[in-house]
Design a protein with these regions (language model features):
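Generic N-terminal amphipathic, Lys/Arg-enriched alpha-helix
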Residues: 7, 14-26, 36-39
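A glycine-rich, acidic short-motif signal
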Residues: 51-147
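Alpha-helical scaffold segments in soluble metabolic enzymes
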Residues: 18-21, 39-42, 53, 118-121
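Glycine-rich, aromatic-bearing surface loops/beta-hairpins
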Residues: 106, 120-186
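Single conserved hydrophobic/aromatic residue that forms the stacking wall/gate
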Residues: 1-10
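Electropositive phosphate-/nucleotide-binding environments in soluble metabolic enzymes
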Residues: 13, 30, 34, 48, ...
Length: 186
């Protein structure tokens, strides 16, 4: 049995396993549940509230499982609230094609923090930074190595009216001349 004893810090493998099993228990497939487990581990690793956010979201959808997003377009609106997990997996699976859109907008996405690790992993695959702009602030994701934000960790947003994803180009902060001068020193 996996449980947290007292104030003992939960190890990453346990976070991933419990997140995966809880997701499967509310109706996600094993494949999606595995992706959820990895994503919650990433959030916790970056000191973001993955467990508490997933717990709240799974309680919300327990009796009404969300629908999958069929296609991702430049602008994505739905009569229903969008599932951050299905949306995140769809982006992760198609990130090489989606980066050509440069900017993608989603409206009414549930628990937007849950999409962040999928985008962080996508950033690693395409080897480019991704900026995520929400109603309450911004995340900058850099190749699954850093997640920067100006959003308070205690801000547990349950829905984002608008979420914008921007695929950024890699840019050098130095000139060709500076590079050549440095290289000559070798």
């Amino acid at each position: 049995r996996l449980s947290l004893v007292g104030s003992e810090m939960c190890i990453r493998d346990r976070i991933e396993t419990v997140s995966k099993r809880a997701s499967k228990a509310v109706g996600y497939s094993w494949g999606i549940s595995e992706e959820i487990g990895k994503s919650i581990r990433i959030l916790e690793m970056f000191n973001l509230p993955g467990i508490s956010t997933l717990n709240q979201y799974l309680k919300k959808i327990k009796n009404k499982h969300p629908k999958k997003l069929k296609n991702i377009l430049k602008i994505n609106k739905s009569d229903d609230e969008l599932c951050p997990i299905y949306t995140g997996v769809r982006i992760l699976d198609n990130c090489n094609q989606l980066e050509d859109l440069n900017v993608i907008k989603f409206f009414n996405i549930n628990y937007p923090l849950l999409i962040i690790p999928f985008l962080s992993r996508s950033s690693d695959i395409i080897n480019k930074p991704i900026h995520v702009i929400l109603d309450q602030g911004k995340y900058i994701l850099n190749c699954n190595k850093t997640i920067l934000t100006n959003i308070e960790k205690s801000n547990n947003c349950k829905i984002s009216k608008e979420l914008t994803i921007q695929f950024e180009e890699n840019k050098n902060l130095f000139t060709d001349t500076e590079w050549k001068e440095l290289y000559k020193l070798i």
